């Protein structure tokens, strides 16, 4: 039995670390709860991206591991569906849609994992499966409504569709935080948070285009995916502090 914490090195008391509280559970070295990346409501996008670079240094596998697990499960399901029902058939299309619904809570679990990482809290692969409970219905209804609303706005023109997508961009993080129990309330909260920040977040996303193009070379994606994932989580964190 270990006598010292594998995170900070302090002596364990009754098997738990008095400093880390979670004993030997993994924790990130983030101190973002104390950091501020905005001034008078203006978000410093460069500072957020620099912080993301700092956090993923020596932690690329930390972010990749849960992402690969989700991708692996998704890939296995896709392969099985194709093998059993054929490719492009009505049956395979229906079963694939059902499989995607099944994977929704796991995608929110992945977001929770990343949020725990950037917040300096304990994070674990089990986070991926923490939403397969009564919140399953909330996640499904919210995702369905977001898809419906975005599609309806897109039918008008491309621009309204983009604006709608930006308005809903914080929904996955809000679902991971679990502070709302109603699908429409989650959607309204995302719209409230993004009010006045849609263009800023759009520009923030555009700033990664160069990195995204590098991913066509395959190897850079090893760095780019964690970088973008953590950067977006940090943006949500800062926006949450601003909006309250």
Predicted regions and their residues:
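Interfacial aromatic "cap" segments that immediately flank transmembrane helices
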Residues: 43-76, 122-152, 164-214, 244
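Juxtamembrane "helix exit" motif at the C-terminal ends of alpha-helical transmembrane segments
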Residues: 74-88, 214-216
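Alpha-helical transmembrane segments in eukaryotic/viral proteins
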Residues: 65, 69, 83, 87-94, ...
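Low-complexity, intrinsically disordered extramembrane tails and loops of integral membrane proteins
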Residues: 1-55, 240-244
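Short glycine/proline-enriched turn or capping motifs at secondary-structure junctions
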Residues: 13-14, 199-200, 224-230
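A generic structural signal for ordered secondary structure
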Residues: 8-12, 62-66, 236
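Selective recognition of hydrophobic, aromatic-rich stretches within alpha-helical transmembrane segments
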Residues: 40, 89-123, 150-185, 215-244
């Amino acid at each position: 039995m270990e006598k010292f914490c594998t995170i900070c090195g302090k002596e364990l008391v009754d098997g738990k670390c008095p400093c880390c509280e979670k004993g030997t559970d993994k924790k990130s070295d983030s101190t973002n709860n104390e950091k501020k990346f905005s001034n008078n409501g203006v978000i410093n996008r460069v500072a957020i991206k620099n912080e993301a670079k700092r956090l993923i240094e020596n932690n690329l596998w930390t972010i990749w591991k849960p992402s690969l697990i989700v991708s692996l499960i998704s890939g296995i399901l896709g392969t099985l569906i194709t093998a059993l029902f054929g490719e492009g058939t009505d049956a395979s299309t229906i079963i694939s849609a059902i499989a995607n619904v099944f994977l929704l809570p796991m995608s929110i679990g992945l977001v929770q994992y990343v949020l725990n990482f950037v917040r300096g809290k304990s994070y674990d692969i089990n986070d991926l499966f923490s939403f397969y409970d009564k919140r399953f219905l909330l996640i499904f209804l919210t995702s369905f409504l977001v898809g419906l609303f975005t599609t309806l706005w897109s039918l008008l023109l491309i621009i309204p569709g983009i604006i709608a997508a930006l308005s809903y961009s914080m929904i996955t993080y809000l679902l991971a935080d679990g502070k709302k129990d109603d699908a429409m309330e989650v959607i309204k909260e995302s719209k409230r948070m993004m009010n006045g920040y849609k263009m800023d977040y759009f520009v923030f996303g555009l700033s990664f285009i160069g990195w995204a193009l590098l991913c066509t070379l395959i190897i850079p994606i090893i760095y780019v995916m964690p970088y973008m994932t953590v950067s977006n989580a940090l943006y949500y964190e800062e926006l949450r502090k601003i909006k309250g």
